[in-house]
Amino acid sequence: MILALRNFWKWSLKRFNPNNRVGFLWLLTLFFWAKTLLAYFLDFGGLGASDPIQFFIMIINPFAVMIIVFSLSSFIKRKLPFYITAIVIDILLTLLLYVNCISYREMTSFVSVNQMLGYSKINQGLGGASISLMRIQDFFYWLDLVVITILLVIKKIKMQETPITKHNSILGLSLGILALFFNLFLADCSRPQLLTRGFDDTYMVKYMGINFYTIEDAVNTVQIDALRSSAKPNDISKVRSYVKSHYAKANSKYY
């Protein structure tokens, strides 16, 4: 038993050692997972979770998209582009999380893709209010990135020359996809038809995570824009005909 534990400990240190590429990606993943939970409970007010299943889903839902995204960076063979890409991905994910924290503090809502596209107008509207919306925990959203970058620069975390094998990259990507389907299964058990019915955005974030919510909102935005661009002036006649044929007269008992 002791020998088995010792071997497992050695395997863990080797696998999750930040001085190799796989360990470095896991380090970024775990830190971002911790930041996401910090946002869930401090900035998003627990997202209305009311039972152990919902809390469990909230705890695991950040992993799927993160594993998928970081696994994509593992296909990069060259040393410097790999580490730069991984850090940039982490910065973008952290920025997305932080912007949603600021938005939720001000408007109790999450940032949609349309709002991101019109960020300059929103920022002008907020003005100096953006600074007043900052909180003490904001420091922790960026701390890991600063520390990891410094450790890379001073070579306390060494950049590994040997690339991640294609087999391991595909394995990591498959693990992320499997985690996503598992998350979807649990979410559907707790809240049936989550993706097909028009629930509040809070439900989507609570069950699937902030990253999945943003992707889902982006897909919906593209579909709506495509429908708008393909709409023709004579389409309104079909709408009017449908409304006219399905018109229900007012009940004389009440009107």
Specify the residue positions occupied by each region the protein language model found:
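Transmembrane and membrane-interface helices of multi-pass
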Residues: 2-224
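Soluble catalytic regions of membrane-associated enzymes that act on cell-envelope
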Residues: 207-255
